[in-house]
């Protein structure tokens, strides 16, 4: 088939690589426009755009993909199907109608669970034991279209969102390729999503990533892992905003929620249940470091609290 691949961030790369090596022809890549990134705020292409250019594939970067001008441009490519992995924009019916076999999205959850922009983070924060990836035919409503296929993935007790997403990106790439094969062969029929079990995973704001120390230790552990690496779980300690990496549970210590206790080798923070031990932290404007090293340098006293 003639395919346009729509995607933007690094987790979309395994899928693009699989399709470039497949029996299908990737005639163009649709990705978000260049954005400013890094400390110098220099303009940078998306990871998907960079990979496409390495392979000599045309790159399309419309700021408004639903505008009539781009709808006409896509129609001129005479594509059979569009494959989508984390493109980053909602698509309107006029654009969805262009390819004769529609738009197929790879979503990193077992739909209808965790529709939306942050399914991996939501599954870890909720304490799910199993998640996966789903290919489905895109409809105007958010992540609601009929399903072509799924793969499952177990969530380990130490998984961060970054680690889990990395595995799903790889297994999902194989699912997307097999879905494209099945559609071309006429061997796949999309099945409507279940009515029950719908949950929503909206984009996470920086404020939502803040740690609420009154919660139980296990919930805080899941929250921190769900926010790692982006946007990063954070708190204020001694007047400094600090990102917090995955933690350990200090079952022999009881501290009031948010109370900080600096030990020789550990920094403990009280929760709604047992205390937790911080491992790595990143104070605002500084590099990642061991929590104990930071605490010594910051000279935290016995009265400090995490807020």
From Swiss-Prot:
GO MF annotation terms: methionyl-tRNA formyltransferase activity
CDD domains: FMT_core_Met-tRNA-FMT_N, Met_tRNA_FMT_C
Pfam family, one: Formyl_trans_N
UniProt EC number: 2.1.2.9
Class of the enzyme per the UniProt entry, highest EC level: transferase
Catalytic activity: L-methionyl-tRNA(fMet) + (6R)-10-formyltetrahydrofolate = N-formyl-L-methionyl-tRNA(fMet) + (6S)-5,6,7,8-tetrahydrofolate + H(+)
Sorted UniProt keywords: Protein biosynthesis, Transferase
SUPFAM superfamilies, per the entry: FMT C-terminal domain-like, Formyltransferase
Sequence positions that bind (6S)-5,6,7,8-tetrahydrofolate: 109-112
Record InterPro entries: Fmt, Formyl_trans_C, Formyl_transf_N, Formyl_transf_N_sf, Formyl_transferase-like_C_sf, Met-tRNA-FMT_C, Met-tRNA-FMT_N
This protein's GO CC annotations: cytosol
Similarity remark: Belongs to the Fmt family.
Primary role: Attaches a formyl group to the free amino group of methionyl-tRNA(fMet). The formyl group appears to play a dual role in the initiator identity of N-formylmethionyl-tRNA by promoting its recognition by IF2 and preventing the misappropriation of this tRNA by the elongation apparatus.
PANTHER family named among the record's database cross-references: METHIONYL-TRNA FORMYLTRANSFERASE (PTHR11138), METHIONYL-TRNA FORMYLTRANSFERASE, MITOCHONDRIAL (PTHR11138:SF5)
Protein name as catalogued: Methionyl-tRNA formyltransferase
Species annotation: Mycobacteroides abscessus (strain ATCC 19977 / DSM 44196 / CCUG 20993 / CIP 104536 / JCM 13569 / NCTC 13031 / TMC 1543 / L948) (Mycobacterium abscessus)
Record lineage: Bacteria, Bacillati, Actinomycetota, Actinomycetes, Mycobacteriales
Gene: fmt
């Amino acid at each position: 088939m003639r395919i346009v691949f729509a995607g933007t961030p690094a987790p979309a790369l395994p899928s693009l690589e699989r399709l470039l090596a497949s029996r299908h022809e990737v005639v163009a890549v649709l990705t978000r426009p260049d954005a400013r990134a890094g400390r110098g705020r220099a303009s940078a292409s998306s990871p998907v755009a960079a990979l496409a250019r390495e392979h000599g594939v045309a790159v399309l970067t419309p700021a408004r993909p639903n505008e009539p001008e781009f709808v006409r441009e896509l129609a001129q490519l005479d594509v059979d199907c569009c494959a989508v992995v984390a493109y980053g924009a909602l698509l309107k019916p006029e654009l969805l109608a262009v390819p004769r076999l529609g738009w197929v999205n790879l979503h990193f959850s077992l739909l209808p669970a965790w529709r939306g922009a942050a399914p991996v983070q939501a599954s870890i924060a909720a304490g799910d034991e199993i998640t996966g990836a789903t290919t489905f035919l895109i409809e105007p409503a958010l992540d609601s279209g009929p399903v072509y296929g799924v793969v499952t993935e177990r969530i380990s007790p130490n998984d961060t969102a970054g680690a889990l997403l990395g595995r799903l990106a790889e297994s999902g790439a194989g699912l997307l390729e097999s879905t494209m094969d099945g559609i071309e062969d006429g061997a796949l029929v999309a099945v409507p999503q279940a009515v029950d079990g719908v949950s929503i995973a909206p984009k996470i704001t920086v404020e939502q990533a803040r740690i609420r120390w009154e919660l139980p230790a296990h919930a805080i552990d899941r929250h921190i892992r769900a926010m790692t690496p982006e946007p990063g779980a954070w708190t204020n300690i001694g007047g400094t905003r600090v990102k917090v990496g995955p933690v350990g549970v200090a079952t022999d210590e009881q501290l009031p929620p948010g109370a900080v206790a600096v030990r020789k080798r550990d920094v403990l923070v009280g929760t709604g249940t047992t205390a937790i031990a911080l491992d790595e932290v990143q104070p605002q404007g500084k590099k990642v470091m061991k929590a104990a090293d930071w605490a010594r340098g910051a000279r935290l006293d016995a009265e400090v609290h995490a807020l």
